[in-house]
Amino acid sequence: MNRILSVSFYLFFLYLYIYKTYGKVKNTDQEISNIYGTNYYLRNGFLNGKNGKGNKYEDLQEEGEGENDDEEHSNSEESDNDEENEIIVGQDGSDQEVKVQKEQGGPGSEGPKGTGGPGSEGPKGTGGPGSEGPKGTGGPGSEGPKGTGGPGSEGPKGTGGPGSEGPKGTGGPGSEGPKGTGGPGSEGPKGTGGPGSEGPKGTGGPGSEGPKGTGGPGSEGPKGTGGPGSEGPKGTGGPGSEGPKGTGGPGSEGPKGTGGPGSEGPKGTGGPGSEGPKGTGGPGSESPKGTGGPGSEGPKGTGGPGSEGPKGTGPKGTGGPGSEAGTEGPKGTGGPGSEAGTEGPKGTGGPGSGGEHSHNKKKSKKSIMNMLIGV
């Protein structure tokens, strides 16, 4: 929008400049006045004596049609400029049209190298809001490489501001790019912290998805340990955790994710919602081996409730009261109120734990719904 306005203003002032410089007929200049001839002024009403226009041609009007009757007279005053001027006379002798090169005058004529006037454009313009060009400094919303500051800046190595996109972005929430530091919702590898981070090696957070998820009730996956409603064998930690070896927060997704809830991305650092492998912390982080935050997805996620993944908590789990169909398998040991369906050898369940090696999304959804209803 700023570009459209700037161009429109420029064209408007350029038009004013050309009109004021060349648009007016200068009656005091004989050469410019002879370009059009008398009939031009008669047709357009310039010989009525108003505003001093046309008074110069009253004597020519008395003589007849003026300069157009005599070609020699019309050419006599411009004979010195025959090399520069090209004179075209109509066959009927009624009008005379002259094309003047390298001469000022005539309305609407444009000349090269005009100086002055507002709105002039040229290279190396300095200042003004919305200026476009490389290495522009300051101003919000500036576009260009190596821009510094301002929120929403786009480009590599951008510093600060929330929502910055690019690799090695530092700070602000929602930053996207590898090795992003801080801010919630940052996307990129090696992001640390932030909830909702996605990426491998996510740590913590309930609901982490991935193999060897640790803790939390309702976790899905083999070898999960503990928590009520956990689904899957050997799952450890938080409720509903999904993913192998998920560590920490509920619902963390991704391997080795560390930190904030829902962090996305590898080794993402800081804010919630960061994306990338090795995201740290935060709930809802997605990535294998996610650590920390709730909802992290990925293998080796530890802890958090609602984590989903293989090696969650199934056989050999020890259960609280109210477990639903958790002990699937013979020799299952259950809390009070556990629902039947002991399918599988040595399945020992927390409350609501659902079977060993169950990778079924429907069962995971049921476990999550049971968790929500139980809460």
UniProtKB/Swiss-Prot annotation:
Gene Ontology terms: cellular component: symbiont-containing vacuole
Question: Pfam families this protein is in?
Answer: S-antigen
Segments for region (Disordered):
47-375
Q: List all Acidic residues biased stretches.
A: 60-86
Where are the stretches annotated 19 X 11 AA approximate tandem repeats of G-G-P-G-S-E-G-P-K-G-T? 105-313
sequence repeat residues: 105-115, 116-126, 127-137, 138-148, 149-159, 160-170, 171-181, 182-192, 193-203, 204-214, 215-225, 226-236, 237-247, 248-258, 259-269, 270-280, 281-291, 292-302, 303-313
**Bias (Gly residues) ranges:** 105-355
In terms of InterPro entries, this protein maps to: S-antigen (IPR008825)
Location comes to: Parasitophorous vacuole
Major site of localization recorded for this protein = other
Signal peptide (residue range): 1-23
Q: Which UniProt key words apply to this protein?
A: Malaria, Repeat, Signal
Q: What does this protein do?
A: S antigens are soluble heat-stable proteins present in the sera of some infected individuals.
Please give the name of this protein: S-antigen protein
